[in-house]
Regions:
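Conserved catalytic network of the ASCE P-loop NTPase/AAA+ motor domain
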Residues: 38-39, 52-56, 83-86, 136-140, ...
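AAA+/P-loop NTPase substrate/partner-engagement loops
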Residues: 83-109
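A short, basic N-terminal segment
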Residues: 1-58, 340-341
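Conserved AAA+ ATPase "SRH/arginine-finger" region at the nucleotide-binding site
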Residues: 95-97, 203-215
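Sensor-1/coupling segment of RecA-like P-loop NTPase cores
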Residues: 43, 56, 62-68, 124-128, ...
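P-loop NTPase Walker A phosphate-binding motif
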Residues: 64-89
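C-terminal alpha-helical "lid" subdomain
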Residues: 227, 231-341
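Mid-core helix/loop region of P-loop NTP-binding domains shared across ATPases and GTPases
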Residues: 101-109, 116-161, 170-173, 234-243, ...
């Protein structure tokens, strides 16, 4: 965002990534997931699918939400809370290329986070490595929660092997819960018949993001971004804020459109920003099929693979010029698989 735009509207910082806007839904979701990790009784109210506890006490947990809803910040705060409480050891898989993550890589992550040694030695022999892992858990004497971000990119074979990893730890006297964080594609993939072995054991939490608090979020993010002595009403009319709240769903969308509105308003000297400027920057394609699928974690490759379609067919479907019969066929298949259409 240009500094001259920020000066014109009295912004101390761009209205993106301004911090954590906590709602009761955020707090309840955090409590529910923490309860699931600790293995305490009672299904959580936000639980989309009640998975079972795996033999030995470990759990498979999934936290899913659309792009830009704040699940990464929620996950980060949850990890910090668990570390502060000290009842659970928190581990993370940091590998960037999630599609190439395998169980040995996850075991390596556990070694690095659980080992008291500065120089961690991991055996190249699988039998020795797995026995050493069991010994690490026995020494830890606490449950462990392994967090995996962008889990919608994990290979199906890796997903199905997570159950065996939890059982391996349990057989050695330890307790491991695995928390997968990803887009709604992850939830839908877990419901596919070929994923039944792990899907039926997964506790899925669907994070609703702001829910109906978009208007409150706009006020909050403006107050967090504006300089001293500048109020939200000085830079954005009430009608303009209400229109943004009605059209947008996530903090990421709101932040991006506020930036666009300020930049467009600066060009014409509009202060405060009114509904005319807001309408000009709102995309008419915001709720088209392609952006909806993208927000849920689907790209061209994943759609081609899942629905046995040709890339050209998917491109034409997204453009709206695929023949009606094939369009109905693909959209019916997508709806049946849980995709937003």
């Amino acid at each position: 965002m240009l500094t001259e735009v920020m000066r014109f509207y009295g912004l101390a910082r761009p209205p993106i990534d301004a911090g954590f806007f906590e709602t009761e839904h955020h707090a309840q979701m955090s409590r529910d997931i923490r309860t699931a990790i600790m293995g305490e009784a009672g299904p959580a109210p936000h639980q989309a699918k009640p998975g079972g506890m795996i033999s030995g006490g470990g759990r498979l947990i999934a936290l899913t939400s659309v792009i830009g809803s704040g699940k990464t910040i929620l996950s980060r705060r949850l990890r910090a809370e668990l570390e502060r409480e000290g009842k659970v050891i928190v581990s993370r898989a940091l590998s960037v290329d999630k599609a190439k993550i395998s169980v040995p890589l996850l075991i390596a992550a556990l070694f690095y986070d659980l080992s008291p040694e500065k120089q961690v030695k991991i055996s190249s022999q699988s039998e020795r490595r797995e026995r050493d892992l069991q010994e690490l858990f026995r020494r830890a004497k606490k449950p462990v929660a392994l967090f995996i971000d962008d889990a919608h990119d994990l290979h199906p074979k890796t997903l199905t092997a997570l159950k065996r990893l939890i059982e391996l730890v349990a057989e050695g006297g330890g307790q491991l819960s695995i928390v997968l964080v990803g887009h709604p594609k992850l939830k839908n993939d877990l419901r596919r018949p070929k994923m039944e072995e792990i899907g039926d054991r997964m506790t899925v939490f669907e994070f609703g993001g702001l829910r109906d608090r978009q208007r409150d979020y706009i006020d909050w993010v403006l107050k967090a971004s504006l300089g001293q002595g500048v109020t939200p009403e000085n830079v954005l009319t009430d009608d303009g804020a209400t229109l943004l709240a009605a059209k947008l769903k996530t903090p990421l969308q709101i932040g991006q459109h506020l930036v666009r509105a300020f930049e467009a308003g600066f060009e014409i000297g509009a202060k405060p920003i009114d509904t005319g400027v807001v309408e000009a920057v709102l995309s008419s394609q915001l709720d088209d099929l392609e952006p909806q699928l993208t927000r849920n974690g689907y790209d061209l490759r994943s759609l081609v693979e899942q629905f046995d379609a040709k890339p050209a067919e998917i491109r034409r479907l997204l453009r709206g010029d695929l023949d009606p019969g094939r369009t109905r066929e693909l959209l019916d298949e997508m709806r049946a698989a849980g995709l937003p259409t």
